[in-house]
Amino acid sequence: MGVGLEGGDEPVGPKGNHAESCPPPLLPFTGGLPHKPRATDFGCSGQHEQHNGLENTDRFTRNTHAAIMPAGNAAGCRTVGGGMERIGFLSFGHWGPGQGSRTRTAADALLQGIELAVAAEELGVDGAFFRVHHFARQQASPFPLLSAIAARTSRIEIGTGVIDMRYENPLYMAEEAAAADLISGGRLQLGISRGSPEPAREGASAFGYSPQPGETDADMARRHTAAFRQAITGAGVAQADPRYAGGATGLLPVQPQSPGLAERIWWGAGTRKTAVWAAELGMNLMSSTLLTEDTGVPFHELQAEQIQRFREAWAAAGHAHVPRVSVSRSVLPIVDEEDNYYFAGSALRDGRDQVGVIDGLTARFGKSYVGAPDLLAEQLAADTAVQAADTLLLTVPNQLGVDFNAKLLGNIVQFVAPALGWSR
C-alpha cells in the first residue's frame, strides 16, 4: 500500500488482485514443485498483478541482458537532468516462513532493519524509512526500531512511511518521537497519515480509539494529528497540580521535547486535496506509488500535479521554512545474474501504471522500474513527479535479506542515482 492512502476498504486491483504499492509477504509453501521466486514475493514490486503461464523472457532479455555487468562498471550511465537531494530506502518489514524468505520471524525483520540501515549509511544512502502496519506480519511499533538504528548510525535520516494516526495516543507518541529524535541527534523524519486498508475490521477500536459522534476515521486521524503536533511544540496539555509541580499552576507540556521535530513531520497524502491541506498546516509531503483518484493522465503526471498544488499552497500559507517532498518508487536495476533471476518477471508484469478501486473510488497505481541501469536512469529522469521531489524513497524487497538489499542499494547509488543529479 502506498504511503498516505486515505481510503476505507481493501483496495482491489486489476483481475481482482489487491493493489498496494508493495505486495504482501510470501505465501506459505503448500507442496508441489517450488516456483521461481519473484520480486513480488518479497514485498518490492509496485503492483500485485501476476500473470499465469510462461513469462516472455525473450522480450525481457532484449531490454535487460546488456545490463548484466561486473560490479564497478558504470558503462551506459549518463547524466539526464535532475537534482535529487536525498535518496532513502523504504522497507515494508515483511516477515514470514514462506519459501525463499530470509526474514522468517519478527526478530529477523527488526534486526535486519537495523543492519540494513547501517549498511545503507555506509553506502551513502540518506534515509532509512519503515512502513507501519498493525495486525500484520510487518513493523507495528516503529520507535524502538528507529531508536536502535539511531544508536548504531550517525548520519542517515530515520523515518516512517507512514504511521496510522487512528491507532495513536497523541501524547504518548509525542514522548516517544521526541526520545527517538534526541537519540538520533535530530535525524527523525516522521511520516504520518490516515492509514491504509488493513486486515482488522475497526482495528483502531481494539486499541481503544473510535471516532467521536459525527466523525469519520479520517477525522479521528486528523484530530490525533493535531494533538500530537501541538504536544511536540511544547504546548501545555495537562493542568499542573501545585502540590507536585513545584508550585506551578499552568498547563504542563509532555517531556522530553526535541527542538525542530515539528518541522520534520510529513503527511502521507493520497489525493491532491489532502496535499493542499497538509501544506496549509505546514507539514511536509510524502507521496507514494498510489493515489486514490484518477484523472486519466499517467500516474507520474497526476502525482506531479499533486506536488505542484502542495508547493503553491505552502507558498500561499507563508510558512517560514522550506518544505520537503518525497515520492516512493520500486527501482530494480539488473546488474548481475542474481538480479535477473529475481526481477525478470517483474519487468513484464509491473512496468506500467495500473488502475484499481479503493472504497468505491478509482485509484491509479504507479509502475515499477526494472531493467538496465542506464534505462532506469532515463525513465526516472522522464518521471515528472520524481523530478519535482527532493527525496526519493526506494521500496526494497526486505525478505531477500540484508546482503541482497545492500547490494541493490549499492547498485542504485552507483549506476542510477548520479544520473538524477544525486551525489553522496
PLM ranges: what are they?
Residues T79, P211-V254, S287-S288, T295-A389:
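An alpha-helical appendage that flanks or caps ligand/catalytic pockets
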Residues I87, G124, V132, I149, ...:
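Conserved, mostly hydrophobic/aromatic
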Residues G127-L146, T289-H300, T395-F404:
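Glycine-rich, proline-tolerant flexible connector loops at the mouths of alpha/beta enzymes
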